[in-house]
Amino acid sequence: GNFFAKANYQVTEQLSLFGDLQYRHVQYKADSPETGLVNDTFRFFNPKAGLNYKFDEANTMYFSYARANREPNRTDYENGGVRPETLDDVELGWRLNNEKIQLNTNIYYMAYKNQLILTGKLDDVGAPIRSNSEKSYRLGLEVDATIALSEQWMVRPNFTLSANKNVDLNVTGTYYGTKDIAYSPSVIVGNVLVFSPIKALHLSLLQKFVGEQLMNNIELPAAKLADYFVNDFNVSYTFKPKTIFKEIVLSGLVNNFLDKKYVSNGYMYDIYPSYYPQAGINFLAGLNLKF
């Protein structure tokens, strides 16, 4: 079952308040060789509240607090007893919006109890295994922008800087202290540069950098995934025929056009790493017909 309520209140021309309430009732019943006997009932109350303050037409700040609960999934039950996770999320942000730039900045602190984290291991059918981290957090800064450099040029940068930590981690009776959460890079940077020599033609350079990350939660050196930087190129041209179709869009995408050899994911078997290498240079073409 699910119940949801939402309210907004305009205090002044500049200040507005909002609140959300959600109640979820989840019941799991199963009896199989994979899961064993399961008869669990979860009752989650997920509130959210915050405020927006508009300084002027271009600048707005916001603050919010939310609690979210999440139940384990079937795969979690198949791989051992796990508990639902609870998240307390606090966010503070600023939005700038004018004719030449749209800028969004957000600072977040996410405090978890029993966070369901990836362990880096796979089960016998290749599904990722998760377990509970009794206490953990994610603290970060997110920034994205759209900047009009001229009528022909536009740039859309974004980045995330974060610290993602298990606190007082204990794995099968061994104490590890505070360690990085698996598959959680602390630096992610992206950019899109768009050139439109004419209105119908768009040429885009897409770039992404992902910092190093780990494939387990105890910072084993062998579990490290190196950082990588990938470049893609996209071109699109729009026709506006007078009959049948309102619009025809031709597009082409060259992924990893520098043919970079990199690994973006992997898993651990005990202390031994395995990797998923990504494709080198590859091409896609598209045709979009709009009636």
Question: Which role does the model predict for each range below?
Answer:
Residues K29-G36, P72-G80, Q115-D124, S162, ...:
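Outer-membrane beta-barrel translocator domains and adjoining extracellular loop/strand segments
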Residues G1-K54, Y77, V171:
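Signature of Gram-negative outer-membrane beta-barrel scaffolds
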